Amino acid sequence: MRPFSRWWVWALLGVALLLVPWPAAVADAVYLGAVLPAWSVVTAALVSAVPLSLSAGLLLFGLAALVAALLWPGGAARAGQALGWALAVLLLTFPLAFGLGYRTTPIAPVGEAAAPAAYAAAREAVLTRLLVTAGPGRAALAAGAPDAAVLSGCVADVAARLRDAPSPTLPTRVKALPPGALLTFGFSGVVSPWLLEPHLDPGLPPAAATAVALHELAHTAGFARESEAEAVALLAGLGCEDPAAAYAAALAAASRLARRLPAEERQAYVASWPEGAVEDLAAAAAAAASYRSGALAAAVERAYDAYLVSLGTEGGMADYDRSTDALVRLLDLALPAPSAGDGVARGRHAVGGGSQVAADEGGDVGVAPHEAPEQHLGVLAVARLQHRAGELAAGVGVEDPLGLEAAERVGV
């Protein structure tokens, strides 16, 4: 039998193509310049046309067919071959459908913090946006998360300004899985890499779910790296005219920026947030924690960390926090920089001038918006509720007050 008639040969070829450290210029030209714009036209139409998850439906259909084949007399051998070839096809197509996105030119310097003054300006600009949008945004979210088509348009707008490449077509639906289906494993959203189909866990409250939806839509726009997807999601929401999207993104961005502050300055910054903001974060963290299985989440996190490292993401899961640095560098795409005497935040609410601490020094508060709880819980990440942050702002004691460390691991 010839080697290329064996499924495992093709499967190994797919793995090899995925692990090759393709030059960014090649990934930009092939993936961003050709494959993604063409393939997304097909996937966006399919995903937008069907309210339920196509990816989940195909998976269930495949499992049913496999069981039927196994039960059929003499069908075990055929079932094994079919399963092998299905795996080979998935591995071969993954690099072109999504995997090359990890090799593209970064939208911001990787692993480099911006100037300290830039973080202070970002905190002020984001706080101003949070104060302005809290009232109308929370009122809108009381009726549910905003329409996915609106979020899709906001993400597409930012994506077009960030990259000099043909614009991909984004889906206008984000599929809801059964509550807890993702949060149990420590994640709040996921994108199907072959169909570019975004999903979220509806076990989260509306503000957090909106942040997750933005993050997953950013993945469908070709931002495979977690830090870039999160930064694009926050930029898209902050600049969005929809008040619910703007509030959800502002809350997530403020949470991430707060994490970089020393404890006292963090507390002062959080104290300047509008009424209800801290409660919204706490509600997201509580919802994520109510579903999370510590053992399962830890195992999935280790696996996903290894996956990210294998695709060239330095630090694996640590990439999530780099979104803060990218957000600060690119914030002018969404919000104008406040002038010296401008904005609600200056004077009355500004804290910490240029001070900040490294992401891993945030101590008692983990702020993570989406994906995982990790990311923004979709932004707010859900979970390492082992840190107690004492009393916050108005004197309300909350575990992991900024509500964040958890939950947002989004990803594939």
Regions found by a protein language model. Name each.
Residues 59, 63-73, 77-109:
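Transmembrane alpha-helices and immediately adjacent membrane-cytoplasm interface residues
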Residues 139-196, 202, 206:
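Auxiliary, metal-adjacent structural segments of Zn-dependent hydrolase domains
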Residues 340-412:
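Intrinsically disordered, low-complexity segments enriched in glycine and mixed charged residues
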Residues 51, 208-223, 227-230, 234:
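Active-site recognition of the HExxH zinc-binding catalytic motif
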Residues 125, 130, 224-267:
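Post-HExxH zinc-binding segment in Zn-dependent metallohydrolases
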Residues 99-164, 176:
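Membrane-interface segments at or immediately adjacent to transmembrane helices
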Residues 14-72:
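Membrane-embedded alpha-helical segments of integral membrane proteins
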Residues 275-341, 366:
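Pan-zinc metallopeptidase signature
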